[in-house]
Amino acid sequence: DAYKKKLFHLCEQFKISNQVKFIDSCKNMALAYKVSDIIVSASIEPEAFGRVAVEAQSMEKLIIASNIGGSNETVINEKTGLLFESGDPKSLSKKIMQALTMDESLLKTMGIEGRKNIVKKFNVEKMCFSTYSEYKRLIN
């Protein structure tokens, strides 16, 4: 489609075609995350959960996500990932440049911190207790 062609053209114009991969659909997401260094979730509409941000962090990958919806709650800016102003391409491009110029050890550390964050927030015991507490609140 026209938008995709425009994105390809921009990648060529800025000489980053070899560094950017556009994926339409993927059957093996674990592998896709594994071979990636940085994940971008550029949602312009709030997602209730922000699954891409959670998946990326669980795979110890740096996530760059818009600061709305679930991503805003699961990504700790500058610690477990990078948040940008939703709908602001300049904010997104600054975060991408920050990630691309980041020291490899910091990139790794942020990935590890992201996984710790997700495991802490979304372990089965905590989620069950949270669900139980909500049901209890609704019943009373």
Identify what each model region corresponds to.
Residues N77-E78, L82-P89, Q98-E104:
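Conserved acidic donor-binding segment of nucleotide-sugar-dependent glycosyltransferases
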Residues A2-K4, S17-C26, A32, L82-L83:
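Active-site donor-binding acidic/aromatic loop of nucleotide-activated sugar
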Residues A30, A48, A53-S58, N72-E73, ...:
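Short alpha-helical segment that forms part of, or immediately flanks, the ligand-binding pocket
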Residues K116, K120, V124-N140:
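C-terminal alpha-helical cap of glycosyltransferases
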Residues L62-A65, V75:
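Short hydrophobic beta-strand element within catalytic cores of glycosyltransferases
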Residues F22-S36, S58, I76:
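Short acidic alpha-helix that forms the nucleotide-activated donor recognition element
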Residues K34-A48, K61:
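Acidic donor-binding loop of glycosyltransferase active sites
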Residues Q98-K116, K120:
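Conserved donor-nucleotide binding/catalytic region of nucleotide-linked donor-dependent transferases
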